[in-house]
Amino acid sequence: MRLIREDSIEKHLVSEVRKIGGIAYKFVSPGRRGVPDRLVALPNGKIIFVECKAPGEKPTPYQLREHARLFALGHQVIVLDSQDLSSILPAVN
């Protein structure tokens, strides 16, 4: 059985988002631990924050804190631990 690594999930996300005309920015915030890995801008004007994880891995407490802050502001945060992008790409329609 081949293990899927977090970086391969992230690369797949970037590639598939690009195919539909979107952009998956690498999101880094110096001095702020736990921000999601990617800020995904989709063609319909929708913005989604995506936390990439290896299969079965869970967000850290710092990441959960940041997810809650973004959610409280009305943003969508998705934890992605597979190459199944159905929770992200339908947002284009």
Curated annotation (Swiss-Prot):
It comes from Acyrthosiphon pisum secondary endosymbiont phage 1 (Bacteriophage APSE-1). Residues 5-84 form the VRR-NUC domain. The lineage of its organism: Viruses, Duplodnaviria, Heunggongvirae, Uroviricota, Caudoviricetes. Divalent metal cations. Mg(2+) is the most probable. Its EC number is 3.1.-.-. Its cofactor is Mg(2+). InterPro entries: tRNA_endonuc-like_dom_sf, VRR_NUC. Nuclease. This is Putative nuclease p44. SMART domains: VRR_NUC. GO terms for molecular function: metal ion binding; nuclease activity; nucleic acid binding. Keywords: Hydrolase, Magnesium, Metal-binding, Nuclease.
